[in-house]
Swiss-Prot record:
ATP binds at G17, V18, S19, G20, S21, G22, K23, S24. PANTHER family: RNASE ADAPTER PROTEIN RAPZ. NCBIfam families: PRK05416.1. This is Nucleotide-binding protein Adeh_0147. It holds the Pfam family RapZ-like_N. GTP binds at D68, A69, R70, E71. Keywords: ATP-binding, GTP-binding, Nucleotide-binding.
Amino acid sequence: MTATVSHAGPQVVILTGVSGSGKSTALRALEDAGFYCVDNLPIVFLEKLLELSGHTAGEVSRMALVVDAREGRFLVEAPRVIRELRQKGADVEVLFLDASDEALVRRYSETRRRHPLAGEGGTVPDGIAAERLALADVRGIADEVIDTTTLNVHELKRLVTRRFVAGDGAKLGVTLVSFGFRFGIPTHADLVLDVRFLPNPFFVPELKPHPGTDPRVAEFVLGQADAKAFLERLVDLLGFLLPRYRNEGKSYLTIAIGCTGGKHRSVALAAALAERLEGSGQPVRLWHRDVEKE
């Protein structure tokens, strides 16, 4: 397994599915896990939201939004928008929640709510049928479909949390973010590390134009004795911390590694740390926040 590097922005989870299937419960689970959550944002505005998140000092590394029948005429645009974002390198996953018609009718009966697509004088089964038809194309591009017919609220929350936060469900989900202090410290970071003590490739003419992902820059940074010592001590520290965080019920950890501009030193160190952690079996997400900024 290799680290996920996304210059396009944060991890995005799109929650969709039929009304009454548990989307609100799933969204609350992700919000509790640290996701920035948006309910009922027209899908056509998603790219703009991701663009804006990349121009603030407090970007989030995880975002979730609900796309459902309330989208109205925008709903037909959802498959196209999602495909285009993926083609541009965005980390977008689609989770579709479903349930049997009988379970949905029962849930509507218990809450005494009208189905949003039932129409004037229509029945809940009529609304369910209309909604399934409207969501067919979105369901077709889903990365995963979860049937919530037999799940209670707590079981669904645990399932969603394990799916999107804790990786394989047994290990702490770790996100590594490289950044530049010039652009602000990531506000959602649990641990912040400053690597500005290392020699800066910015002052080496042949290295200055290239990011820390370039092998020449990485070799320059990681070849320093202090960088090697720092990395070894950091791996040891995390080997001590991660299982203890997990035992305390923490399901995710965001580690931010910063240098001056977020282009060279922090990028090389974050990538090296991700490789070391994944080599030990620890799931890692890697995001170079500022590598393309000037």
